[in-house]
UniProtKB/Swiss-Prot annotation:
Gene that this sequence comes from: tsf
Keyword Protein biosynthesis: yes
Record keywords, A-Z: Cytoplasm, Elongation factor, Protein biosynthesis
GO MF annotation: an example: translation elongation factor activity
Location within or outside the cell: Cytoplasm
Function as written in the Swiss-Prot or TrEMBL entry: Associates with the EF-Tu.GDP complex and induces the exchange of GDP to GTP. It remains bound to the aminoacyl-tRNA.EF-Tu.GTP complex up to the GTP hydrolysis stage on the ribosome.
Protein name stated in the entry: Elongation factor Ts
Listed InterPro entries: EF-Ts_dimer_sf, Transl_elong_EFTs/EF1B, Transl_elong_EFTs/EF1B_dimer, Transl_elong_Ts_CS, UBA-like_sf
Amino acid sequence: MAEITAAAVKELREKSGAGMMDCKKALTETNGDMEAAVDWLRTKGLATAAKKSSRTAAEGLVGVSVEGTKGAAVEVNSETDFVAKNDQFQDFVRTVTQLALTAGDDVAALAGAGYPGGGTVAEKLTSNIATIGENQTLRRAKVVEVSKGTVVPYVHNAAVPGLGKIGVLVALEGDAPVAEMETVGKQIAMHIAAAFPQALTEDGLDPVVIERERAIAAEKAAESGKPAEIVEKMVQGAVAKFRKENALLSQVFVIDNKTPIAQVVANAAKAAGGSITLKDYVRFQLGEGIEKETSDFAAEVAAAVKG
């Protein structure tokens, strides 16, 4: 058995683009033969997968799943929208979303969770990259839970049940009848998909974002040429408006365009004859915050020729 050195592992990694542990295993399996190790990685699809992993993945699917009083949302990205229609990819997203209910929303822990049929989520993802032919990434996950009540899932324009481009979870705590909670929860979920709140409450808004809005408002108000005290009131008003428009409980319900969400919940509780509290929510929009690569056809061909 040839000695597998760190230098050899490093060289193979540079040749193949595969991970360190995969390179070490390849060298072990081929008794240190570098070219044979490259071929071994290629036959396993690992070299190809690693090469594809450098490409931007900003399409894909968001999945939502609920079990009892717990819900999970997961985003898995691919390079093109075409892959989102692939049955194998859809099955993977659906399965990982269900696994998140027990594995939790730490992406590293979820990636290391056991996948049905053997291996881990991460290993299944690597296999999918090789077989489907596009880079894919497990981007994020979020789990919400209530002690008593319900978690309501919603997918806007679902590609298939539970999967789409915008996934929402609404966590409602209380002792009101579950059917009544699910009705108002579905309405609020649709509101969240459309209104894009940044936090549950005004106090939950990012202070950095608030200060940025304050600075913008101050600059605009200063241009008015009004007295300082008037300028300050203008700034305060602009910030208050921003807070109200971006905190879920303060937002005006999109369905009637007049009732704050907090009041919508209170009205539902009163009508149901029980308590309902909007405890938490999740809104995942596919590719949100990812800068997509743009290139023309000629550039793509040239890139492919260069390898």
